[in-house]
Amino acid sequence: MQKFNSLTSIPAYLPIVNIDTDMIIPKQFLKTIKRTGLGKNLFFEMRYDDNGNEIKDFILNQKPHNQSKILIAGKNFGCGSSREHAPWALLDFGITCVISSSYADIFYSNCFKNGILPITLPEEKIKELSEYSKRKEEISIDLNEEKIIFGNSEIKFDIDPFKKKCLLEGLDDIALSLAKKEKIITFEENLKNNKPWIFNDKN
């Protein structure tokens, strides 16, 4: 997983509430277990018409927002069914930070596991930041200092210390497990010695 320290980008503002995971990445694209290639299908039904052509009015089809790394979204973002493909699609598109006033719990957790920073802010702060999307001006995210910098102002945000550490160091579930590899091996060896009947090891 890529480390997340800081980020500067023109944000894309998508002021739609209750965007669920099926809207983020529809079910017909969930057959793959690869994390790459999903970005082109992000927000598929909002980005494309029935003939597969891009809908020009959609924010992520417009320059420079089609290169945005920061998505400002409506409340309750990522609700609906649990699918890790949702953060995969965002990440593959290039979005590594989402800003909203609220998230579905599972989606929120999945973001951290895949290197995406989900920031929670009050609605009035969301509106303030959305102006930078409209004006096509950059904002900056500083995870270490837990702040968003825009113009001559800044907004502080809160994040769980452990989740922050994982993003800063690029630690996903596999990396966290491997960090305790020696302890896991020792535990397995002790268990095998104390309760050998549990194991069916013919070697």
UniProtKB/Swiss-Prot annotation:
Pathway: Amino-acid biosynthesis; L-leucine biosynthesis; L-leucine from 3-methyl-2-oxobutanoate: step 2/4. Its EC number is 4.2.1.33. Gene3D superfamilies: Aconitase, domain 4 (3.20.19.10). One of its GO terms (biological process) is L-leucine biosynthetic process. The keyword Protein biosynthesis does not apply. Transmembrane segments: none annotated. Pfam families: Aconitase_C. SUPFAM superfamilies: LeuD/IlvD-like (SSF52016). Catalyzes the isomerization between 2-isopropylmalate and 3-isopropylmalate, via the formation of 2-isopropylmaleate. This is 3-isopropylmalate dehydratase small subunit. It comes from Pelagibacter ubique (strain HTCC1062). The lineage of its organism: Bacteria, Pseudomonadati, Pseudomonadota, Alphaproteobacteria, Candidatus Pelagibacterales. The gene is leuD.
